[in-house]
């Protein structure tokens, strides 16, 4: 036997003690709060949790890259210990799940909509498999003291973080309480919310930590066990196929059942492995030589070497090539799996399903006989390996047992954004957890952009007290906002609602001189007035006059408006100033004076929609700029009060028609983030945006991007900008309404978002022709 394996078997060997209590079944001796467990004589373990990556929807090239990176991770495992990779399938606790996602009633006249929204969420949660898949790496080592173990695990932590980061996954240490919670949730399924453990309190009272996690009873039979009122069974992989597909683990763990699958890996030093293979190869060559000698003695000089001896020679040489030329490592592996059910009948049916999946992959799984307790302790992420059925493998062979499948997004306190198109689990996004909350909604007309935005608005209106501000160029949001108790501000030539383009609250700008910031904004407005734009002289005049208007206001002058600014132009001597006064006359004293009056809009309502449908083409871009500036003022006021603001800007591409308005929006985008505002830009003209360097930078720097069905040129540009694979592009090619891809931080997840059509909320949110009678009634 190889020295490494012999040593590990010797170190793992323990005196068998018949357990006299359920606590004694749990093979843990000592725990520390940082997550290190002592599970045997000088044997310490530590568990790490890692996140999933999009392996199932990756392109062939990307899959190969991920496979090689995962193989590098396996090769990095230390020979001095053993490593266990565990996939934990657990069903979400119904009570905790509902408490986390449902909106509480508030008796404010909107509970009717809350009930509809909650019913939709419950229907989605019931139809999905409600399973959470968690993935762990448990590293074991043999050290004399806890200090030595801590030093060892510190080095392992650094290596694991580095390798998982290259895979696109995140790896984090599991502390003592969380590791006990994993075991508690397995041992006491259905009682997840009842877990409470404080190590200091437990030590003070002299209680064993096992009392907090163990089930009420354990009964081990020949080929199954009972754990409390649940049944369980442990299987192991007895026979491996010659070629295993990389989706076998994904299929085994795709069952809608509580189960844990563990792969134990024992790496062997390369020099030992080469020595062992040379010894085996020498033995095969000796057998072939002896066989040939016997044939020659019988005067049979042309005999062909028997097939089995030829195969042994070929396989030994291939193994040697793997070790010496292909940077493979020899590893010993064992795959175990424990699954539980509510009845023996259900358990038997689930076992047969798992055995069938194995047979389909040409692998043979077997039930452990009279070893169910040892198998259970091997399958759990504790660090034990009590099943000796190890198989000799290479790094490549172990890497085929790929634990990755698809990324899930299920943040506490998140907004429902649809269902994962692959796993069918709910997608719950909490933008607070992202590096920045900036969002984009992109898609062709009819793909479901407005509906997606309205779903977010509904949740925010019903579940939070945050302010919601919407810029509505197509009058699509008014009926919904009024139903939610909000206010509609109609901005148009001749309208009674006015927004002063020169309003400026205390704290306006990026922290510099607010008058200079406002002057830049006024310059961007004047760029809209003439297709030729404004020249350097005119910019100087505008800058000077804006400064004078605000200076006079501080000394008791008139409230700054565009009319006051025009009068200031008329006072100047330069002919360019007179030209500016003439150009601005239409927008200050003429028929397009919507932004030249003092503001008379009530800003106390927390939900406001700015309806700019009737502004006309000449004022549309100016309207977007002025409303965004007004939103900035509101955001600044809310920020001072510690209040969050959500902003929705439709037809976003319009503002990038010239350099100044684009620069203003880029600046506003940064200020929103700094002042606790969550902006969302909505547009159908993706190609137009991506042609602007500023806009494409804004998109690439945004952490939350919803991509619905895209036109061909838009798809290609988005794929380049956001590194989307060909397979993932399929989810935004000829996609149904409400279906696509969501980029959430570093995750890229395909989703489907379908809302029940027989609800009041659907009628308020839809813009589909024939179903939008409420919105058409406002036109």
Predicted stretch roles:
Residues 722-778:
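Conserved P-loop NTPase
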Residues 449:
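Conserved lysine of the Walker
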Residues 53, 60-79, 90, 253, ...:
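P-loop NTPase motor domains
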Residues 459-469:
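Post-Walker A helix-loop "phosphate-sensing" segment adjacent to the P-loop in P-loop NTPases
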Residues 452:
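Hydrophobic positions on the alpha1 helix immediately C-terminal to the Walker A/P-loop
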Residues 441:
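Hydrophobic anchor at the beta1->P-loop junction of P-loop NTPases
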């Amino acid at each position: 036997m190889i020295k490494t394996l012999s040593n590990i078997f010797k170190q793992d060997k323990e005196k068998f003690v018949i357990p006299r209590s359920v606590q004694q079944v749990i093979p843990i001796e000592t725990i520390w709060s940082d997550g290190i467990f002592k599970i045997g004589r000088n044997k310490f373990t530590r568990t790490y949790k890692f996140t999933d990556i999009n392996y199932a929807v990756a392109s062939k090239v990307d899959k190969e890259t991920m496979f090689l990176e995962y193989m590098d991770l396996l090769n990095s495992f230390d020979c001095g210990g053993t490593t266990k990779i565990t996939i934990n399938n657990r069903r979400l606790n119904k009570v905790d799940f509902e408490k986390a996602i449902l909106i509480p009633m508030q008796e404010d006249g909107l509970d009717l909509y809350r009930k509809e929204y909650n019913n939709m969420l419950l229907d989605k949660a019931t139809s999905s498999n409600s399973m959470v898949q968690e993935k762990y790496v448990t590293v074991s080592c043999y050290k004399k003291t806890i200090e030595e173990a801590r030093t060892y695990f510190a080095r392992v932590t650094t290596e694991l973080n580095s390798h998982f980061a290259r895979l696109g996954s995140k790896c984090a240490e599991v502390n003592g309480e969380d590791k006990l919670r994993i075991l508690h949730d397995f041992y006491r399924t259905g009682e997840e919310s009842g877990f409470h453990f404080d190590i200091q309190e437990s030590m003070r009272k002299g209680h064993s930590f096992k009392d907090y996690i163990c089930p009420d009873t354990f009964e081990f039979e020949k080929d199954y066990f009972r754990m409390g009122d649940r049944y369980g069974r442990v299987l192991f992989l007895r026979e491996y196929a010659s070629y295993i597909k990389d989706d076998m683990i994904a299929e085994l763990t795709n069952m809608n059942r509580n189960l844990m699958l563990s792969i134990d890996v024992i790496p062997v030093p390369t020099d030992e492995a080469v020595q062992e293979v040379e010894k085996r190869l020498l033995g095969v060559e000796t057998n072939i030589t002896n066989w040939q000698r016997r044939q020659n003695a019988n005067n049979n000089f042309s005999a062909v070497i028997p097939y089995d001896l030829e195969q042994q020679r070929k396989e030994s040489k291939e193994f040697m090539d793997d070790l010496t030329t292909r940077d493979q490592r020899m590893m010993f592996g064992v795959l175990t799996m424990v699954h539980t059910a509510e009845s023996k009948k259900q358990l038997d049916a689930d076992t047969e399903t798992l055995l069938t999946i194995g047979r389909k992959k040409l692998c043979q799984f077997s039930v452990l006989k009279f070893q169910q307790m040892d198998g259970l302790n091997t399958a759990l992420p504790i660090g034990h390996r009590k099943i000796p059925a190890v198989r000799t493998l290479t790094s490549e062979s172990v890497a085929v047992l790929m634990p990755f499948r698809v990324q899930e997004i299920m943040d506490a306190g998140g907004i429902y954004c649809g269902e994962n198109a692959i796993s069918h689990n709910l997608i719950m996004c909490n933008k607070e957890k992202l590096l920045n909350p900036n969002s984009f909604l992109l898609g062709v007309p009819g793909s479901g952009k407005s509906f997606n935005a309205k779903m977010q608005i509904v949740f925010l209106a019903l579940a939070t007290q945050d302010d919601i501000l919407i810029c509505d160029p197509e009058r699509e949001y008014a009926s919904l906002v009024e139903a939610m108790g909000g206010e509609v501000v109609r901005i148009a030539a001749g309208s009674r609602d006015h927004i002063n383009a020169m309003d400026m609250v205390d704290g306006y700008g990026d922290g510099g001189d607010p008058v200079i910031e406002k002057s830049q904004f006024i310059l961007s407005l004047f760029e809209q007035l003439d297709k030729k734009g404004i020249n350097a002289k005119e910019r100087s005049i505008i800058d000077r006059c804006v400064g004078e208007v605000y200076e006079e206001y501080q000394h008791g002058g008139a409230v700054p408006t565009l009319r006051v600014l025009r009068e200031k132009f008329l006072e100047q001597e330069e002919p360019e100033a007179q030209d500016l006064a003439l150009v601005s006359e239409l927008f200050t004293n003429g028929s397009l004076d919507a932004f030249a009056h003092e503001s008379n809009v009530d800003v106390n309502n927390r939900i406001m929609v700015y309806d700019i449908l009737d502004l006309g083409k000449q004022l549309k871009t100016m309207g977007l700029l002025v409303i965004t500036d007004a939103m900035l003022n509101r955001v600044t006021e809310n920020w001072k009060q510690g209040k969050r603001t959500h902003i929705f800007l439709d037809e976003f591409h319009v503002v990038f028609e010239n350099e100044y308005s684009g620069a203003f929006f880029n600046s506003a985008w940064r200020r929103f983030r700094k002042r606790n505002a969550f902006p969302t830009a909505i547009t159908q003209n993706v190609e137009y945006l991506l042609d602007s360097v500023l806009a494409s930078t804004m998109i690439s720097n945004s952490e939350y991007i919803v991509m619905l069905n895209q036109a061909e040129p838009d798809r290609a540009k988005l794929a380049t900008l956001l590194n989307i694979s060909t397979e993932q592009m399929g989810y935004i090619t000829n996609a149904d309404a409400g279906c696509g891809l969501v980029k959430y931080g570093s995750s890229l997840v395909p989703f489907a978002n379908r809302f029940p059509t027989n609800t009041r909320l659907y009628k308020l949110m839809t813009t589909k022709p024939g179903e939008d009678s409420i919105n058409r009634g406002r036109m």
